[in-house]
Design a protein with these regions (language model features):
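Glycoside hydrolase catalytic-domain context in secreted enzymes
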Residues: 1-539
Length: 539
């Protein structure tokens, strides 16, 4: 299996896939490649494709049918460019708000996560009965649950009891009922399961729990670069610290891993040597190869591994797909506060100051795990929707300029939030508060005495207590996707009535975050906005 990332056009993507398959066809056995993509929110690594909001935004819609439609679009766009495996859906339950990958989850409610993830699996795999020629392989992650992290820091899972573990396994049990084809283990293993081994070498996790107890017969696929990561981090395998590849390879085969992400070609000669020396059981390797080849046959890639480049160019990211994407972004908009200032009037003779670095940044709408995408930023969209009688001014991050411009503004829209990222959040794990220059921008705008609207983008539940006490309205947009700028502007000007509901609790302060249990949902003390909060116009 091969992982592809960051392709700058649909045509380049389709041509690349065909080139890969041509190379494979000319190899000794001519076995086609099963190409995967780390596409956790649409065909996100292809510029010009349908790049949806992250799952946290989709969770705010509470719309299972809409999530299904978006997953079907993603499936068909993957197939159109020749990619037949997605490293999603994300089944983690966001019980620790500091975790950097909260944005990829459907929030902290195990029931909502289970419902939405199951809908994605069925859509990706074109039905409930396993793979077929109209499917892509869904690789569900990160088993057995990566949402609980010690102080939010990746690779430190803290599931504390057998009862809590069962809660975090709930989406996996549901996915097994609809024949999920592939599952990816997490980097580390919760101590409740295994105190000695890295995830990909944990027999207790993968063989005893996933295979034997839960009955999973599909592909266990490691994340990319995990063998290297274990070597560099002096991880543990089979209860001993190891850095040599031999011990790691023996350990992962004994734990019944099928696919080694990103390192199979580099390690194939060593795998053969270890097998010939009797250190790796050939029957285990045969079983792993059988699972992967079986999936390729079920998908039909042996019969036709190639894609139609011309069709891909006209199909991927088409207007109909983007219309559904925009519908989802609209439904994700979550109005946290409104003292009556919203909706703003269109075509009003007024000066609107839009400020904050996130307002001019497309990546802050799309979020991580993405290539560069085109679209309207928040500032562009506000200018487009304000009307010809309005004057819209944008200032990114010069606090002195913002303070001066605010004096002549009638309305100030301040955009705050974390910039795009993948694993480690730019604001770190120690705070969820708006800090630094963005807080200075808020205070400069507030000093003008003019009406203020705060627009929040990002992937975690930020502490918005200052904004709640000092601004007139707060619109939470999450990472809404490539159509997010339009959805935000439409909501601000009343063309979209916000109906989104928070998919997790928003903390009031960091003390409540530090005092909560990282593996338990709904346990923040006195949250600023509770789970399920969200206003609409007229309320």
């Amino acid at each position: 299996m091969l992982l592809i990332r960051e392709l700058n056009s649909v045509e380049a993507a389709a041509v690349s896939m065909n080139t890969i398959q041509e190379y494979a066809e000319g190899s000794r056995l001519g076995v086609p490649v099963l190409v995967s993509m780390d596409s956790v929110h649409g065909l996100s690594y292809v510029s010009g494709a349908t790049v949806t909001g992250h799952n946290l935004a989709l969770a705010a819609t509470r719309d299972e049918d809409l999530v299904t439609r978006l997953a079907e679009i993603a499936r068909d766009e993957h197939i159109a460019i020749g990619v037949r495996m997605t490293l999603s859906p994300e089944a983690d339950i966001a019980s620790e708000p500091r975790w950097g990958r909260v944005m990829e989850t459907f929030g902290e409610d195990p029931d909502l996560v289970t419902k939405m993830v199951t809908a994605q699996v069925v859509a990706f795999q074109n039905g409930r009965d396993g793979l077929n020629t109209g499917a892509i392989v869904a690789c569900m992650k990160h088993f057995p649950g990566a949402g609980p992290q010690m102080e939010g820091k990746d690779t430190s899972p803290i599931i504390s009891s057998a009862e809590t573990l069962q809660i975090h396994l709930k989406p996996y049990y549901a996915a097994l009922e609809v024949n999920i084809a592939s599952i990816m283990p997490y980097y580390s293993v919760p101590l409740e399961l295994d105190m000695e081994n890295s995830a990909i070498g944990s027999k207790a996790t993968l063989q005893d729990l996933l295979r034997d107890e839960m009955g999973f017969e599909g592909i266990i696929q490691t994340d990319w670069g995990m063998i290297w990561a274990i070597q560099e981090g002096r991880g543990t395998m089979m209860g001993e610290e190891v850095s040599d590849e031999e011990a790691i390879l023996i350990g992962i085969t004994e734990s019944r891993v099928d696919g080694i992400g990103g390192e199979s070609i580099r390690l194939i000669d060593q795998m053969e040597e270890l097998t010939n020396a009797g250190k790796i059981d050939e029957d285990i390797l045969t079983a792993a190869a059988t699972r992967i080849v079986k999936a390729k046959f079920e998908l039909g890639v042996f019969e036709n591994p190639y894609c139609d480049v011309e069709y891909a160019v006209q199909f991927v990211g088409n207007e109909e797909h983007q219309a559904v994407n925009l519908e989802a972004a609209r439904k994700a908009m979550t109005l946290l506060k409104n003292d009556g200032i919203l909706p703003l009037k269109q075509n009003e003779k007024q000066t609107i100051l839009v400020c904050g670095p996130r307002a001019g940044d497309m990546d802050s709408l799309v979020g991580g795990w993405s290539s560069a995408q085109e679209g309207l930023t928040i500032a562009d969209a506000v200018a487009a929707y304000a009307g010809e009688n309005a004057t819209v001014i944008y200032e990114s991050d010069n606090v002195e300029s913002i303070a001066e411009l605010a004096k002549d503004a009638d309305i100030i829209i301040v955009s705050v939030g974390e910039p795009s990222y993948q694993h480690d959040p730019p604001w770190g794990y120690d705070t969820l508060e708006i800090t630094g220059s963005q807080q200075e921008i808020l205070e400069a705008a507030k000093a003008s005495g003019k009406p203020m609207v705060t627009v929040v983008t990002g992937g975690r539940p930020y502490i918005l207590t200052w904004c709640d006490e000092n601004t007139n309205a707060i619109l939470e947009a999450y990472y809404p996707g490539s159509q997010g700028g339009i959805a935000i502007a439409e909501t601000l000007f009343g063309l979209n009535n916000p109906t989104g509901k928070t998919p997790l609790q928003f903390p009031r302060d960091m003390d409540s975050v530090r005092n909560q249990e990282g593996d338990v949902s709904f346990d923040l003390e006195n949250p600023l906005y509770d789970y399920g909060w969200g206003l609409s116009y007229g309320e």
